[in-house]
């Protein structure tokens, strides 16, 4: 059974995550004090029910040792996993401005900006221990819920989920990536006026890239590298592997190569998925 501990900065999406986990059959508890985690797990152990518990800055223990002790006292039937949600400072400020809600640390007479910074410092012990950190800055509510469904179904089936994610460097590197590959040196379809409005999902762009030996070599060497270490990653008690592929705009080269890698590993029987950050962002 899984005990999913959901934490993160206020405004990053903990409530959304908890609702998504509840939809997946988890028994969910919001804002449970850390010291009560062993009691909750013991009560649920006989029912064979996976649980999800959210922890925010208000019920953090006074020291990291108390959290570690609570983890050590969990029943052996449970496999604890720590999910930490985060977002950049400006996004959190905007979300609070939109909802007009008070920050949990506002009772300390701190400004919103100071409360966000103080919370970041207080939650660092949990962030550093997290099994998965998700940056929700560019995510909608639905995208976050879908990502959790993808990741958790892989976890509950005890199968490594490989996520090949394209992105544009001008939009920033995904912080949830385990590996980042830069393909900005490869031939760029952007400079062909006919291909510029298309994406790496379109056949003419794929045909353009497929004509170049260096593109084939890059795909071959990248998949060979991943295949070399995949057996160790699969036995390392992890549920997902995120491989980010970046080009300048995240529209052509990175999309094509992410799709090629995902197709290759799917053909080898792996649970491989593709995600295109720039293309998804342009649709929203």
Swiss-Prot record:
Tagged with keyword Iron-sulfur: no
InterPro entries in the record: P-loop_NTPase, RapZ-like, RapZ-like_N, RapZ_C
Positions annotated to bind GTP: 56-59
Amino acids binding ATP: 8-15
Pfam families documented for this protein: PapZ_C, RapZ-like_N
Region feature RNA-binding, mapped onto this chain: 266-284
GO molecular function, one term: GTP binding
Keyword Acyltransferase recorded: no
Domain of life: Bacteria
Keywords: ATP-binding, GTP-binding, Nucleotide-binding, RNA-binding
PANTHER family on file: RNASE ADAPTER PROTEIN RAPZ (PTHR30448:SF0)
Family: Belongs to the RapZ-like family. RapZ subfamily.
NCBIfam families referenced in this protein's UniProt entry, alphabetically: PRK05416.1
Function statement: Modulates the synthesis of GlmS, by affecting the processing and stability of the regulatory small RNA GlmZ. When glucosamine-6-phosphate (GlcN6P) concentrations are high in the cell, RapZ binds GlmZ and targets it to cleavage by RNase E. Consequently, GlmZ is inactivated and unable to activate GlmS synthesis. Under low GlcN6P concentrations, RapZ is sequestered and inactivated by an other regulatory small RNA, GlmY, preventing GlmZ degradation and leading to synthesis of GlmS.
Protein name (record): RNase adapter protein RapZ
Species name: Sodalis glossinidius (strain morsitans)
Name of encoding gene: rapZ
């Amino acid at each position: 059974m899984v005990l999913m501990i959901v934490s993160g900065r206020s405004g990053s999406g903990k409530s959304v995550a908890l609702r998504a986990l509840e939809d997946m059959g988890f028994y969910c508890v919001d804002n449970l004090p850390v010291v009560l985690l062993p009691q909750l797990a013991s009560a649920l152990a006989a029912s064979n029910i996976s649980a999800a518990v959210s922890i925010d800055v208000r019920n953090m223990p006074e020291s990291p040792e108390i959290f570690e002790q609570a983890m050590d006292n969990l029943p052996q039937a449970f496999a604890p996993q720590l999910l930490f949600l985060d977002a950049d400072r400006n996004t959190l400020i905007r979300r609070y401005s939109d909802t007009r809600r008070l920050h949990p640390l506002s009772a300390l007479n701190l400004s919103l900006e100071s409360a966000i910074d103080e919370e970041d410092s207080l939650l660092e012990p949990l962030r550093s221990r997290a099994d998965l950190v998700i940056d929700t800055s560019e995510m909608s509510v639905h995208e976050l819920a879908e990502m959790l469904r993808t990741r958790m179904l892989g976890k509950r089936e005890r199968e490594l989920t490989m996520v090949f994610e394209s992105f544009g460097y001008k939009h920033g590197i995904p912080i949830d990536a385990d590996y980042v590959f830069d393909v900005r040196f490869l031939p760029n379809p952007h400079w062909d006026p006919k291909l510029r409005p298309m994406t790496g999902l379109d056949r003419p762009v794929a045909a353009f890239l497929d004509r170049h030996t260096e593109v084939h070599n890059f795909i071959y060497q990248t998949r060979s590298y991943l295949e070399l270490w995949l057996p160790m990653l699969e036995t390392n008690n992890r549920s997902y592997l995120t491989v980010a592929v970046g080009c300048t705009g995240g529209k052509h080269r990175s999309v094509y190569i992410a799709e090629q890698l995902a197709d290759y590993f799917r053909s080898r029987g792996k649970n491989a998925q593709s995600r295109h950050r720039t293309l998804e962002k342009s649709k929203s």
